Amino acid sequence: MLFRSIFKQMKEHNTPHVWLDATKIKDFAERFPTIYSSCLDNGINPNTQLIPVSPASHYASGGVKVDLNGLTTVKNLYACGETACTGAHGANRLASNSLLEGLVFGTRIAEIIAKNIGEQEDPIEEDQKIFLADPAIKMPLQLAMSQGAGVMRSAKSLTETLAILEKLGQHQSTSPRIESWEVSNLYQLAMAIVKAALLRQESRGSHWRSDFPETLDIWQKHIVQKLDSDGNWSSREEVVQK
């Protein structure tokens, strides 16, 4: 895929980006107005200058395990969109399909909730340990994931990334604010991704292992992970039903 070639060039030449030549696209501003505006804001004129580009994560193919009605394993808790793992996208989402998924499953969930909504009850008292990460770990977490668990993965890079994440997880926050919750969510998602990527010893869709470049039939499975209230992770495999 294109992003692998870009990443390979960046690694070989030790550069943070490659150059995109869009100067031959006469109607660039009309076809890509958002990108054009962003380039101008950063002092780049796409009509006359090369654009620096690099791969970036913008979608998670996994998510909270749900059924075809968006119901999670927690009673009366539903999830849809990028939050959920419906299986609709397979191993790699096609552009714009996330909008269709959100519309379909969002409608299903809304209809079910509307039919079964009960009386409002008092909130449940929190009686479990709460993990809150220090917002300061956000940047090193993102760097570790991009370098070791991003476009190109291997047992070595993933193991090193997991070690970094475990160290970062020791930096916790005692202040329950938005930044703490956001980084906590990023941290737990990163852990789930790295652990699953280590288990999946093959390449499939957007998951590419340089040490296991082939796609294997025995890996037509979902990897389901669970984090218990004591912070312990467990994984199991579910064969995809045809």
Language-model segment annotations:
Residues T34-Y78:
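FAD/FMN-dependent oxidoreductases across multiple families
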Residues M1-I51, L103, I112-G118:
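An anion/pyrophosphate-binding glycine-rich loop and adjacent beta-alpha core
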Residues S5-Q9, T15, Y59, K65-A79, ...:
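Glycine- and aromatic-enriched mobile tails/lids
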